[in-house]
Regions:
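N-terminal beta-alpha lobe that positions the nucleotide/phosphoryl donor
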Residues: 1-172
Length: 172
């Protein structure tokens, strides 16, 4: 059983995890930036470590520091939402260094980061998915063909991002 969790996140996301930990009698570790030093999640955690004097949120993306603190404190790492939660390399580093990563394994994170692969995995698992393609479309004509099959509106998406909602074939 996990006895201590470092939350590699901030604000309300960290607080939700910390509250759950308290109910489950699990010790908590916060990481924070200089700007967040007075934040509720920092005060609420049983231990707190400053990872940067930078005001930027990118400080929460410093895997070396977060791993070092997790090892020092003997904590598992909960990435929360965003930041490191979708970083397969970070999850893999945790695995390699013997630190428990609370979340999907690195291979799953990597696969779910590729939209067409994610759709395939979800379909095979019997999960409901919105109509679309499981292979990348090649050009506007193929997009129009898919749109005709599934109906408008559609969301046109690259593998790593999403483009605006398309209401009809004229806006393609």
């Amino acid at each position: 059983m996990i006895k201590k969790i470092l939350v590699a996140n901030r604000g309300e996301i960290a607080m939700r995890i910390f509250r759950t930990c308290r109910v489950m009698d699990i010790s908590t570790v916060a990481v924070y930036t200089h700007v967040d030093r007075g934040a509720l999640h920092v005060r609420y955690a049983e231990e707190a470590y400053c990872i940067s004097n930078s005001p930027e949120d990118t400080s929460y993306l410093k895997p070396e520091l977060i791993l070092a603190i997790a090892k020092k404190t003997g904590a598992a790492i909960h990435p929360g939402y965003g930041f490191l939660s979708e970083n397969a390399d970070f999850a893999r580093r945790c695995e390699e260094e013997g630190v428990i990563f609370i979340g999907p394994g690195a291979d799953i994170i990597a696969k779910m980061g590729i939209k067409t692969e994610a759709r395939k995995i979800m379909r095979e698992a019997g999960l409901p998915i919105v109509p679309g393609t499981e292979t990348p479309v090649q050009g506007i004509e193929e997009v129009k063909k898919v749109a005709k099959e599934v109906g408008y509106p559609i969301m046109v998406s690259s593998i790593n991002s999403i483009y605006p909602l398309v209401s009809d074939s004229r806006t393609l």
